[in-house]
Amino acid sequence: MSNVPAELKYSKEHEWLRKEAEGTYTVGITEHAQELLGDMVFVDLPEVGATVEAGADCAVAESVKAASDIYAPISGEIVAVNEELNDSPELVNSDPYTDGWIFKIKASDEAQVAALLDAAAYEALLEDE
């Protein structure tokens, strides 16, 4: 079973969300998602300053197996991207919940966070797949 940190929120599309300061959240893909994709070769990062809607594709993870869209779990403005992934996309595989984060988003509606899955609900989703 994949590692599912209890302090994070999750989307049904296998993104995770970690609360930072002042309405900002860090986003990445889950361990389960990176296991399905295999070794990352490139991550197409979103543009800082871009406004995204919850559920909209805003980045792409390319692996040896496939290219997969990464979706914004909440609406808001992209305030940072993980530039380390330009040279080391494998961080998404080796450390998906810390060094392999993909972008940071300033929430336009923090109520959307409550609609995301907690760790137990995400684990249940994985069991059903």
UniProtKB/Swiss-Prot annotation:
It comes from the Bacteria. GO terms for biological process: glycine decarboxylation via glycine cleavage system. InterPro entries: 2-oxoA_DH_lipoyl-BS, Biotin_lipoyl, GCV_H, GCV_H/Fam206, GCV_H_sub, Single_hybrid_motif. GO terms for cellular component: cytosol; glycine cleavage complex. Binds 1 lipoyl cofactor covalently. Keywords: Lipoyl. Its cofactor is (R)-lipoate. The modification N6-lipoyllysine is found at residue 65. Pfam families: GCV_H. SUPFAM superfamilies: Single hybrid motif. The glycine cleavage system catalyzes the degradation of glycine. The H protein shuttles the methylamine group of glycine from the P protein to the T protein. Belongs to the GcvH family. The glycine cleavage system is composed of four proteins: P, T, L and H. This is Glycine cleavage system H protein. It comes from Klebsiella pneumoniae subsp. pneumoniae (strain ATCC 700721 / MGH 78578). The gene is gcvH.
